[in-house]
C-alpha cells in the first residue's frame, strides 16, 4: 500500500508543477532552473529535471542523507510525468493556486510514505540539519537560489509570479507540512543505499 501511496503522491507533485507551468504566470523557481538547463543543454524538461535532481541528490548524500524508493522514482519519473501533464492540461492562470498547493502537499505525502524523499526534499532536509533551520527558511533560500540560476539562463518564463513564489513557497510548504503532520527531519525512512 505504501508503494501505491508513493506513486500517487509523485503524481500530485508532478501535477502541481505542471499546473503552475500551464498557468503561464511564471514558473516555480526550481522550474526556472530546469528551464535554464533545457536551454543550455538543449534537452527536454524531463531530462533537465533529472539532471537537477541528481545534483541535489549528490549534495544530500554527501551530507549524509540516504536514497529510498521515493528518491529513485522521483528522479526517474517526476519530470516525465510533468511533461505528460503539461501536454494535456489547458493553459489558464486559474491553475496556479491549485499547483501551489499540490506541490508541497505531494512532497509531504511522498515523504510520509517512509520510503525516502525526492531529491529536492532530501536537499532541503540536508540543509535543515546542516544549518539547524526550519523548512520555511531553508526552502525560501533555496527557491531564491533556483530563481537566480533561472535568471542566468535568461528564462523568459520568470515573471513577478516566480519572484513571489521564490519569497513565499517555503512558507506555503512549511504550513502544509504542519497541516498534514509531516516533519522531514524526524520521520524514519526505509533506505535502499547507505544504511546506517
Regions found by a protein language model. Give the residues of each.
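Core subunits and conserved enzymes of cellular information-processing
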Residues: 1-196
Amino acid at each position: 500500500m505504501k508503494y501505491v501511496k508513493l506513486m500517487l503522491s509523485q503524481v500530485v507533485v508532478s501535477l502541481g508543477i505542471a499546473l503552475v507551468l500551464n498557468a503561464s504566470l511564471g514558473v516555480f523557481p526550481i522550474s526556472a532552473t530546469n528551464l535554464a538547463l533545457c536551454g543550455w543543454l538543449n534537452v527536454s524538461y524531463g531530462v533537465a529535471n533529472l539532471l537537477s535532481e541528481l545534483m541535489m541528490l549528490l549534495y544530500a548524500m554527501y551530507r549524509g542523507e540516504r536514497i529510498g524508493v521515493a528518491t529513485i522514482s522521483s528522479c526517474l519519473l517526476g519530470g516525465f510525468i510533468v511533461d505528460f501533464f503539461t501536454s494535456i492540461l489547458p493553459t489558464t492562470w486559474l491553475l496556479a493556486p491549485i499547483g501551489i498547493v499540490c506541490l508541497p502537499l505531494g512532497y509531504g505525502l511522498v515523504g510520509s510514505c517512509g520510503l525516502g524523499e525526492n531529491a529536492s526534499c532530501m536537499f532541503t532536509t540536508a540543509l535543515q540539519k546542516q544549518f539547524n533551520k526550519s523548512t520555511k527558511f531553508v526552502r525560501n533560500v533555496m527557491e531564491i537560489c533556483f530563481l537566480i540560476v533561472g535568471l542566468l539562463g535568461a528564462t523568459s518564463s520568470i515573471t513577478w509570479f516566480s519572484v513571489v513564489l521564490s519569497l513565499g513557497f517555503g512558507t506555503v510548504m512549511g504550513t502544509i507540512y504542519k497541516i498534514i503532520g509531516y516533519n522531514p527531519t524526524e520521520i524514519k525512512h526505509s533506505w535502499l543505499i547507505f544504511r546506517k
